[in-house]
Amino acid sequence: LAELQAELASKDKAMRDLKDRVSAALTGFEGKGLTVEQRNGRIYVSMENKLLFPSGSYAVDAKGRELIVKLAKAIENEKELNVLVEGHTDTDKVHPGGGVKDNWDLSVMRATSVVRIMQESSRMDPLRVTAAGRGEFVPVDPADKAKNRRIEIILSPDLQELYKLVRD
């Protein structure tokens, strides 16, 4: 039990330290549609779409690319970190054209655009990175469409060592 508690404490400290490094790397973006929070043993980097994409598009603009590259560089050496990039949309219908069928499709394509930039600009292990789309189904605030249009990057520690300790 003591070994398990020590491993848990070590993971928690590592995540706090990582949150501080991520926040430091993204200084200048916080308060402008970006938040970095630690909850439930994970780090959540939430970016409003205005920081990344033109309306209805999944092409990341120059300022968004700068933000994503800074984040990727800040976490590229974290070998025991899983990275989930989630795209979220509002409930407005997507305009036909541009290869986007609906909000779910748009959210996946936006998440994939972010993952591609992270991969191109860093040494992150692609086996640890996942792109996912949540469409309009997980709103932050149903009354605030702008807040719901976002990318969330969820950084989770690899818990295999903890599982091994529990089994043994």
What are these regions (language model features)?
Residues L1-E37:
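Extracellular/lumenal/periplasmic "stalk" regions immediately C-terminal to a signal peptide or transmembrane helix
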Residues D12, L52-K70, E78, H88-R167:
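Periplasmic OmpA-like peptidoglycan-binding domain that tethers envelope proteins to the cell wall
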Residues E30-V36, V69-N77:
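Short amphipathic alpha-helices and their capping/turn segments at secondary-structure boundaries
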Residues Q38-R42:
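Short Gly/Ser/Thr- and Asp/Glu-enriched loop/turn motifs at secondary-structure junctions
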Residues I43-E48:
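Short, aliphatic-rich beta-strand segments
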